[in-house]
Amino acid sequence: AGRKVRVFKHGPDYLDPMVLEVASGQPVYQLHPWMTGEDECRWRLMEAAQDADLILVEGSMGLFDGDPSSADLAKLMGIPALPVIDARGMAQTFGAVALGLSKFDSALPVYQVIANRIGSPRHGAMLRESLPEGISLLGAIPRNEAMSLPNRHLGQIFYLITQTFSYHPNLQYL
């Protein structure tokens, strides 16, 4: 509690930054090397770092999808990736997916992951146990159909998502 968080969004998205701005209480800018240029991306991050305790950049699509991808931006800016992995219906495969993401591009560090849509505390423990050495589980978000994100009406479930997130991933370890 009490941390000043600055949030950015990768990609040409206009709805997500508005939602993220409400959540963070700070302006949210897009970081996209092709749209805004590398210098603009660096300047925005450096400016935010002057007074922020934590900077989060929400990616777009899959980590390695798009041109430039979220991974490309992270490498360009020297930011480690924190993948959120849909864990529904997985146990040991969760560890394989995390390992694959960490090894796919050796220039992109992946130290932690977040499990999304877990079924129970035991499921979360199984996911944690499946992770290879060097990758830890930062948090596990329970499955809750009320928090699913349909393409429309995203703002209607924002409160529920923020309440649930506040009880699960432990941001003090970031």
Language-model regions, residue ranges each:
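Internal gly/pro-rich beta-alpha loop/helix module
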Residues: 91-174
